[in-house]
C-alpha cells in the first residue's frame, strides 16, 4: 500500500465530527460520526482515534487531512496525529489552495468546510456550470460554486435544530420533539403541528432560497444536500437534486489528492 494511505480525513464541525479512511483509489472504506467535544486534549483524541480504528478492524492512517471550524480542536487533532501516529496532517485553509478562486470580499475568511464542499461538488459539474451545496449542520450553509474551482459566495442560515432549541427555550410548555416530517401539513396535535412548522417550514425556506440563488445565476445550477439534517428533509425539498451524505468528507479527500498532485507536478 502506498505510504500516503490509508488517508484519514477529519471534518470537525460545531456539533459533530465526521471522520473517514480512504484507500489509494480515494474511496472511503470506513466512516464515523462522533460528537464534537472541545474539551478533549491531544492524548484524549489519540485514544479515541485508536479505539475507532481498532473496533472497526481498520488500519492505522499514514497520512491525514483536517478541516476544522473549531481551530483549537483542529490543532489538538494535528498534535495527536503527529505525536501518537507519526502523521503530519494537512490543515485546510484558503491560502494553502492556490488553484481555488474565492470570490468573497475577504477570501481568507472562508471556512475550511466550505472549501471541502467545493471539491466534493466537482463531480456534479459535468453537466452544469454551477452547483449549490446545501450543508445542513449547526447552521445551514448554501455554497455557490462554479466550474474551475470558483467559490462565488453563499447564504448562512440558522440550523433546524438550533431553531427548534430556541423555540423550546422561549416556550416552556411546548414539548421537545424529534425533528421528523409528519404525515400531513395540518397538525391535529401539538407534536405534529410543531413537526410541520419546523420540518416543512424549514424545507420551504430552503426551496425559496434555492430559487433565489438560481434566479441570480446566468445558467442552470445543480443543488446537492449534505450534512446530518439532510436525511430528515430528503424528498421534501423540491429544489434539491441530489442528497450526498459524504460530500464534505469526500471533498476533503479529493482536496488532499489535488494538492498532492500539484506538489508532485502531475
Curated annotation (Swiss-Prot):
Keywords: ATP-binding, Coenzyme A biosynthesis, Cytoplasm, Kinase, Metal-binding, Nucleotide-binding, Potassium, Transferase
Residues at which substrate binds: 111-114, 190
GO molecular function ontology, one term from the record: metal ion binding
Species for this entry: Deinococcus geothermalis (strain DSM 11300 / CIP 105573 / AG-3a)
Predominant location category: cytoplasm
HAMAP family named in the record: Pantothen_kinase_3
Biological process per Gene Ontology, one example term: coenzyme A biosynthetic process
Protein name per Swiss-Prot or TrEMBL: Type III pantothenate kinase
Subcellular location: Cytoplasm
Subunit structure: Homodimer.
Cofactor(s) this protein requires: NH4(+); K(+)
Domain of life of the native organism: Bacteria
Binding positions for K(+) per the UniProt entry: 135
Keyword Transferase on entry: yes
The protein's role, per its UniProt record: Catalyzes the phosphorylation of pantothenate (Pan), the first step in CoA biosynthesis.
Classification via CDD domains: ASKHA_NBD_PanK-III
Its EC number(s): 2.7.1.33
Amino acid at each position: 500500500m502506498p505510504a500516503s494511505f490509508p488517508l484519514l480525513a477529519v471534518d470537525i464541525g460545531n456539533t459533530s465530527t465526521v471522520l473517514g479512511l480512504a484507500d489509494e483509489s480515494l474511496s472511503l472504506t470506513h466512516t464515523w460520526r462522533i460528537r464534537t467535544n472541545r474539551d478533549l486534549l491531544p492524548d484524549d483524541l489519540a485514544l479515541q482515534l485508536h479505539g475507532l480504528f481498532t473496533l472497526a478492524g481498520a488500519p492505522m492512517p499514514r497520512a491525514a487531512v483536517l478541516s476544522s471550524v473549531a481551530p483549537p480542536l483542529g490543532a489538538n487533532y494535528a498534535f495527536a496525529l503527529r505525536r501518537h501516529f507519526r502523521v503530519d496532517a494537512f490543515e485546510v485553509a484558503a491560502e494553502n489552495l492556490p488553484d481555488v478562486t474565492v470570490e468573497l470580499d475577504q477570501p481568507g475568511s472562508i471556512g475550511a468546510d466550505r472549501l471541502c464542499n467545493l471539491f466534493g461538488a466537482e463531480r456534479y459539474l459535468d453537466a452544469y456550470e454551477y452547483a449549490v451545496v446545501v450543508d445542513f449542520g449547526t447552521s445551514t450553509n448554501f455554497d455557490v460554486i462554479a466550474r474551475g474551482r470558483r467559490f462565488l459566495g453563499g447564504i448562512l442560515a440558522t440550523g433546524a435544530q438550533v431553531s427548534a432549541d430556541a423555540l423550546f427555550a422561549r416556550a416552556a410548555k411546548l414539548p421537545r420533539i424529534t425533528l421528523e416530517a409528519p404525515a400531513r401539513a395540518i397538525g391535529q396535535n401539538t407534536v405534529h403541528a410543531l413537526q410541520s412548522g419546523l420540518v416543512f417550514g424549514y424545507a420551504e425556506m430552503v426551496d425559496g432560497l434555492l430559487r433565489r440563488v438560481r434566479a441570480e445565476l446566468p445558467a442552470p445550477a445543480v443543488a446537492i444536500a449534505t450534512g446530518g439534517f439532510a436525511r430528515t428533509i430528503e424528498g421534501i425539498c423540491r429544489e434539491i437534486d441530489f442528497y450526498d451524505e459524504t460530500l464534505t468528507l469526500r471533498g476533503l479527500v479529493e482536496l488532499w489528492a489535488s494538492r498532492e498532485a500539484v506538489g508532485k507536478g502531475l
